[in-house]
Amino acid sequence: QEDGTPDIETSKLLSDTFALSSNFAANLMLRQIGGGGVGAEWQGALKMTETLRGLGLQNTFMTTPYDTERQTQTMVTPANSDKTWDTEPDGYRQTTAKDIGLVLEWIVQCSQGGGTLLAAFPGQLTPNECQQTLDYIALDRNRILLETGVPPDTRYAHKHGFVSTAHGDVGVFWSPAGPYIVSLFIYKPGWMEWELSSSIMADVSKAAWDYFTLVANGGQPPDVDTPLPDPAAPITATAPITPAAP
């Protein structure tokens, strides 16, 4: 559209993709990106991959649309070439916590009138369109994973996803100190329990929120080289204890 506003059909697809995690809607979006014809979702996946790689994201690709039996060759990346850890990634759709976190960071920066996307696509993208993208991402509201680590009235936009062995979530949260991004993928061989990933993500999210809230209030976070206290050490009072009244 001339004013950058998605038409009704595209808006519905975006809403279903983010709010409902609909693979069907995501495939139709890929079809639009690929040109709009039947089967163009394959070209859309390739175009998306080429665009992201052109922005420097070498660990992100999509060679096959969702829920399809037809398969293509996988892509070799720096991440999947590192055999230190085997997280059983999907052979046809991959990213990393860093890559997806950068994409969200770029969208936020674009919505504020600066950053990588506006520089890379001059005249093709506007801050308003990037804000609309954040609004669609913000439709993912379930109070799970990273969401549970921040106060309920916090402004945020996040997108989660999961398979049997891995759970992931990436979000931008507006703290008193400004927006910050948390991107976290957790893998466990065999089966990733929801209770485990939920607890870890809630703790990480709360720690990030507490850190930026402390900074906003003028507090000094501990130096990264400060040793943690010995949990076995005896507890000593740091302030006088008022005697109980007789």
Describe these PLM feature segments.
Residues 34, 92-97, 101-246:
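Structured C-terminal helix/loop/strand segments within mature extracytoplasmic catalytic/sensor domains
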